Amino acid sequence: MALTDRLLDAWYKGHPALTLLRPLESLYRRVVDGKRAKFLAGEGDIYRAPVPVIVVGNITIGGTGKTPLILWMIEHCQRKGLRVGVVSRGYGAKPPSLPWRVQPDQSASEAGDEPLLIVQRSGVPLMIDPDRSRAVQALLAAEPLDLILSDDGLQHYRLARDLELVLIDAARGLGNRRCLPAGPLREPVERLSSVDALLYNGATADRDDGYAFTLKPSALINLRSGERQPVSYFPAGQALHAVAGIGNPQRFFNTLEGLHWRPVTHAFADHALYSVQALTFTPALPLVMTEKDAVKCRAFAADDWWYLAVDAVPSDAFVGWFDEQLLRLSP
């Protein structure tokens, strides 16, 4: 088990050795608390865009379903006639320059897997740059936009925001509720009281402190041909290789099991880079991966490689609340 996997396991299941990391946790908290205090005091170089900025972020390390929810938000806003742009750090991307406008025909190594997925699915203008303020300014210089969505960036306080949404995995929760490196939290748990909404991925109903949303499998899409099939294409009991290089691979594997398939699971690091050799398994079976992984594998995909497309389905209460916020933020 890789070190990151062992840490995740300890954060969410407990381990006595984590107490040794608490002095480092105290130092980490001092730094993040200081950054937020400067932001609240209006100190430092803080950029406020001329259009509303909505941050869709995490307080924990690991995947929470951000990309599908952002895609839902894009589509929902576009149906209301809003021109939407997205900014992202572009984790793992190596563009020729920064900020960098992501195009659908670029490689994942150039654009980053999640930004490329968002552009290929939605067609929205998207700029990557670790400096999100600079990304927003470049995006607004290139396109007339009504709204900016920030893919993550909850802790990027140089960018002023009008709305903060935090996603939490309903099954894993906040782990041991401690900050890095003694726990999975990027900021102290008290930070959640200051955000505008919590969304629980996988919750079956809204909670007192937040809204529910689920990820619904919508189709199987062949990496090589683009052929689209319903999820019933594979019968119940179908054995297949399952590949996931995301923040929480087990959630993807659980989804496949929920479709009554029999996955042979292969978990990779988040944002992993793939090769034919890395994805050649025995016995020979169809291979199903996440859409985020698929954007990195199309160039060398075999005929029986598929990805499972999923759509975010937020609760009616969240949709109503979000519409109210859009109305409030409208000029």
UniProtKB/Swiss-Prot annotation:
Pathway: Glycolipid biosynthesis; lipid IV(A) biosynthesis; lipid IV(A) from (3R)-3-hydroxytetradecanoyl-[acyl-carrier-protein] and UDP-N-acetyl-alpha-D-glucosamine: step 6/6. Keywords: ATP-binding, Kinase, Lipid A biosynthesis, Lipid biosynthesis, Lipid metabolism, Nucleotide-binding, Transferase. It catalyses: a lipid A disaccharide + ATP = a lipid IVA + ADP + H(+). GO terms for molecular function: ATP binding; tetraacyldisaccharide 4'-kinase activity. It comes from the Bacteria. The keyword Membrane does not apply. GO terms for biological process: lipid A biosynthetic process; lipopolysaccharide core region biosynthetic process. ATP binds at T60, I61, G62, G63, T64, G65, K66, T67. The keyword Transcription does not apply. GO terms for cellular component: plasma membrane. Its EC number is 2.7.1.130. Belongs to the LpxK family. HAMAP family: LpxK. Transfers the gamma-phosphate of ATP to the 4'-position of a tetraacyldisaccharide 1-phosphate intermediate (termed DS-1-P) to form tetraacyldisaccharide 1,4'-bis-phosphate (lipid IVA). NCBIfam families: lpxK (TIGR00682). This is Tetraacyldisaccharide 4'-kinase.
